[in-house]
């Protein structure tokens, strides 16, 4: 269990934000035999191994230096004598990364991998599709110093790229499908998911920021795609990757040991989750939690306690990457008045009800189903990219309710509350307690 301990003896509403955070990996909690038993180091899409350290500008692996090397290699086909560093490229099409699947049989679950290609292969394959590769089309993702490699992403509109790969069985697959198909116990899979999420967010941002918001002129990439700049000489506005902050909160009725869960009309049947909403300009995180809870359910919130955060690059394409900021919020009033324009329903649920929703949802079964779907897509058997996230009991009976899977921060907020003693979440010794062990 990943526990976040805040070293303070009291909880004034604002002071917890400045407390030191210590990672304690010693505690584990098992929900039931039906749930997965594993420890997560980070949320899905966090923990990108390419983002841990950005080299200094003088380093050959830095964005600036790597980009200069890239420009010398683009006009020619690199060969084995290419100087360090080498380059790998991850192609995307319509927000979907290139992947391949391996290892699936009657007894084992297939495993998906990112479909990295060499710079030389990328150029040749794109040329065969009538697409010219240039330095402005590539976005810097980061280096792996131990492998002497720098990683890039490129956005393609041509599905013909895949057919040129021949027998390699690669395909562009929706990131949401890969998210569900990732084995949460496999650090490699979580690392690749984080890399793909970061790449998609950057590429989508480039797609929606092609024109200057100040003067309307075209923008062009700078610093290996890490920012953009207006092409108008009198404007020259700098534009940086967009991140949309969202508060997501589990509202708790401390006196009656209940949690408030809600449904939106777009949810699959029987799924319940936390309240969430975008932060408005000039608003603190705590104020956003209280406002969103009041607007959507009519419930007043008092104390607000931070849990953890998660990048979320699988939202609408108009928002390339949301940052989900998770909180526990403690209710001052209990009467629910649902805003039907925002929610389909909201209800208080007892700890036991929520625990059952965690226990009966076969998250591992969903992961295996999604992994098999990725394999079928890569083989060309399955063409649909849609994926049901509904879960059933092993007996085939429908569970009365379930919550989002371990790939979502909502799962960990809810599971952290379920597995704590009633007073622990708001104890004077710790807050923001855990990414649950599943």
From Swiss-Prot:
Residues that, per the record, bind Zn(2+): 212, 215, 230, 235
Report the residue ranges where the short sequence motif Nudix box is annotated in this entry: 277-298
Please list the tissues where expression of this protein has been recorded.
Expressed in roots, leaves, stems and inflorescences.
Q: Is-annotated flag, keyword Protein transport?
A: no
Name this protein carries in UniProt: Nudix hydrolase 19, chloroplastic
Nudix hydrolase domain residues are 241-371
User: Which residues does the annotated transit peptide occupy?
Assistant: 1-36
Q: What happens when the gene is disrupted?
A: No visible phenotype under normal growth conditions.
Q: What is its EC number?
A: 3.6.1.-, 3.6.1.22
Using the record, list the residue span of the signal peptide; answer none if the entry has no such feature: none
